[in-house]
């Protein structure tokens, strides 16, 4: 298993950034070989997104990547919700959806088709996984979103001086744009769904999951109902769990074989 730490200059973020790449390209003699059907089809690529306060660390077991023959790309989205902010150097959505994908294509020959390109995340990264696949449906074929921080309806109600203890009004405005306009903007996954449907475009495969004791469960249920109302095919799963790696680990073990098997 190759573990690479890469530094590159990002024009979207106007600085040098670091990210991790895990590639199952060095089979070991002391473990069973990869099944021929996975080796023969070529390596797929999973872009893996962290949550609020997180960074570029891999949280998908490497043995799954080795078994199903997929590379894992783990960038850092800081606390920017994986979308394009207002300030110069804050195009985190374009960095992930365009710049980083193109870098992986030209450097490693990976992620060449949407069928071979996946995005997965939890919490803020779950929002990012869903939003990114909908914003770049010709690039990402599958989105897996765990315990997603689908907070745009809350952001829409924020006014100057707002502070919920996690972040203040200025932070949310920087990430999402003017709160009063966020519901109609492309930073709202619901808006992206409606636009794709109106244009007759194929939507990515969507997989969502949330723990029944998670503080974000109602937000995820609302998105599930919205997708049902829009007749958007998707997988939605609930199980006992809170907002933690125990539940997200269950999601990975349950759905990675479905996604890559």
List the predicted regions and their residue ranges.
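Non-catalytic cap/lid and distal C-terminal segments of serine-dependent acyl enzymes
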Residues: 1-261
């Amino acid at each position: 298993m190759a573990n690479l730490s890469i530094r590159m200059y990002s024009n979207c973020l106007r600085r040098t950034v670091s990210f991790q790449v895990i590639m199952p390209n060095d089979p070991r003699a002391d473990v069973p070989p990869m099944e021929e059907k996975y080796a023969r089809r070529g390596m797929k690529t999973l872009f893996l997104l962290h949550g609020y306060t997180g960074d570029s660390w891999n949280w998908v077991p490497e043995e799954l990547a080795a078994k199903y023959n997929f590379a894992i790309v783990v960038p850092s989205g800081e606390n920017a919700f994986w979308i394009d902010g207002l300030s110069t150097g804050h195009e985190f959505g374009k960095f992930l959806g365009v710049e980083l994908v193109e870098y992986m294509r030209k450097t490693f020959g990976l992620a060449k088709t949407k069928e071979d390109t996946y995005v997965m995340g939890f919490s803020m990264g779950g929002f990012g996984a869903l939003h990114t696949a909908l914003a770049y449906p010709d690039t990402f074929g599958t989105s897996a979103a765990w315990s997603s921080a689908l907070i745009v309806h809350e952001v829409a109600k924020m006014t100057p001086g707002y502070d919920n203890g996690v972040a203040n009004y200025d932070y949310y405005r920087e990430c999402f744009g003017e709160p009063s306009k966020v519901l109609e903007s492309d930073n709202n996954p619901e808006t992206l769904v409606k636009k794709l449907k109106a244009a007759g475009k194929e939507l990515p495969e969507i997989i969502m999951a949330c723990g029944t004791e998670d503080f974000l469960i109602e937000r995820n249920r609302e998105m599930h109902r919205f997708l049902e109302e829009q007749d958007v095919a998707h997988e939605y799963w609930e199980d006992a769990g809170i907002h933690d790696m125990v539940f997200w680990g269950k999601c990975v073990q349950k759905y990675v074989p479905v996604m890559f098997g």
